[in-house]
Amino acid sequence: ENVLEEQPEMMTEIFREVDNPRLRMCLDVGHVNAYSPVPVEEWVSACAGFLSHFHIHNNDGSQDTHCAPGEGTISMAALLRQAQTLCPEATFTLEVLQAAPAVSWMLEERILEG
């Protein structure tokens, strides 16, 4: 899992070096938004070949606040579509402080359908 890494290459280099299909990456999109100057969408594109799991939460980009997906600066619906396209087998953990707003957002955006 990425925590304070500023560039996706900091993670992809490790996975390329180890070169083992059993070692997969968890992308914490809130950490990317708070700690990296690289947009989350670029991280997904750069790391797609190694990604198997995502931690989903949002923030305003200044700190890791674990807000609901619809409450922050990440365009979460677009990001989840990108993740489903590039990493169709990936799983997701909703990592928020309050579940109700997150579930409401997922229902409104029809994230759980399909």
Features from the language model and the residues they span:
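Histidine-acidic metal/acid-base catalytic patches
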Residues: 8-27, 33-114
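Conserved glycine-rich "GG(E/T)P / GGGxP" loop and the immediately following alpha-helix
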Residues: 5
